[in-house]
């Protein structure tokens, strides 16, 4: 990851005078335990998990009136394609929103990590627009789309993987598959080395 470009995406994190213990990258088992602790009280089709950033399912993505009501300006479909959630630019024709589609499988062997930086850039740019509001979705809104939102928070908001999971889980229950969790672990380790967290 090009550090100059990555730095353009990050917001500075303010640290207090007290030095915390060094960050310990989480194991896969500890991440899965963290995800099993359900924090969100209800199951919704769409939830705001970060200011102006929404995580949702296929139903939410197809509910044009709800998207208009929420003021969604950008949609990231992590389950694009004819045999998945087949929305797209044509589906949203006549609406003032931008569309970004990724043909990703919810499969532990699918490499979603190649999309981490491009999607983070897209979300950051969309949120930088006045009144920019982004929906990231897949079929169920718990694995593919959640993984991309977690990566965004790690890359652009300088969160650890654990912090990102806790942030999202406070608003929506998520469950990235084990392969996606491993890819997020790799990102967490790489960002940790680059930022000196450990």
From Swiss-Prot:
PANTHER family: AGAP008228-PA, DUAL SPECIFICITY PROTEIN PHOSPHATASE 13 ISOFORM B. Gene3D superfamilies: Protein tyrosine phosphatase superfamily. The keyword Hydrolase applies. It comes from the Eukaryota. Keywords: Hydrolase, Protein phosphatase. GO terms for cellular component: cytoplasm. This is Dual specificity protein phosphatase 13B. It is an enzyme of class 3 (hydrolase). The active site is at 138 (phosphocysteine intermediate). Residues 45-193 form the Tyrosine-protein phosphatase domain. It catalyses: O-phospho-L-tyrosyl-[protein] + H2O = L-tyrosyl-[protein] + phosphate; O-phospho-L-seryl-[protein] + H2O = L-seryl-[protein] + phosphate; O-phospho-L-threonyl-[protein] + H2O = L-threonyl-[protein] + phosphate. It comes from Homo sapiens (Human).
